[in-house]
Amino acid sequence: MIYTPINAFALRRYKHILAVTKAFKYMLMLRGFKEERIDVIYNGIDFSQELQTYDMYTFFKNINVPHDLNKKYVGIAARLFAVKGVNVFLDMAKIIADKREDIDFIILGNGEMWQQCQDFIKGNKLENRVYMAGQVTDPVMMNSYYKYIDVNTLTSYSESFPYALLEGARCKCATVATAVGGIPEMIIDGESGCLVQSGDSKALAECVEMLCDKDDIRIRYGVNFYERAKENFSSQAMANTHKKIYEKIIKENVK
């Protein structure tokens, strides 16, 4: 109740506003901000450097997850808070685990829902199917995570333009995410990933199973996401957009 009025008051005193997504720009316009005052600059990450990773054996050993070459691995890297929809990920895992044994699940992250997640796993006898690896701070481990899982997921109820998806894209990891915030601007459904409605664990399970079963689609989505992100959401693309906007602002002020 305090945050919104204070920010609205501050934003109205600026001549130009930079929004991280078109969705956020539209939200500001609905609140009365003029469209010409708002420019969109997407988050970007570095695509120019070769990523360091551990070998597969070391990665799985470090997160205490048994590795089986005959299985697919589906992951989520998120803070364990309600807004991240980790409960939806767990519901999806149960749906799949109840009918097949060739897909396991990995959760990276800590948070207030840790015990709730543990209780769900134990209560549904998923201890050997869903693995909670905790918080990972080593960037090489995170690169390895996106390299060695088969499907990356994001189940949030609210997001802006999440780096977790861009990091997965950089490793050509196929992705299933909720269609919230700026995510539909990042992922083209059916081309560079799969989008589902927030809270829909059944749709999430269907997409995950499809990608695990169809290697050609999974690989194609990962490559397409990589190419799209490299072109539009790299740190260089972000810098170029900043430059163009600043040049436009300077030109306007010179008049």
Q: Predicted segments — roles?
A:
Residues 157:
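Aromatic "clamp/platform" in nucleotide-sugar-dependent glycosyltransferases that forms part
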Residues 118-136:
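Nucleotide-activated donor-binding/catalytic signature segment of Leloir-type glycosyltransferases, i.e.
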Residues 135-136, 144-149:
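Short alpha-helical donor nucleotide-sugar binding micro-motif in glycosyltransferases
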Residues 72, 76-95, 112-118, 202:
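A conserved mid-protein helix/loop that constitutes part of the nucleotide-sugar donor-binding site
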Residues 189-190, 194-201, 210-215:
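Conserved acidic donor-binding segment of nucleotide-sugar-dependent glycosyltransferases
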Residues 23, 44:
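Carbohydrate-associated surface elements
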Residues 174-177:
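Short hydrophobic beta-strand element within catalytic cores of glycosyltransferases
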Residues 51-67:
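A short helix/loop element that forms part of the nucleotide-sugar donor recognition site in Leloir-type
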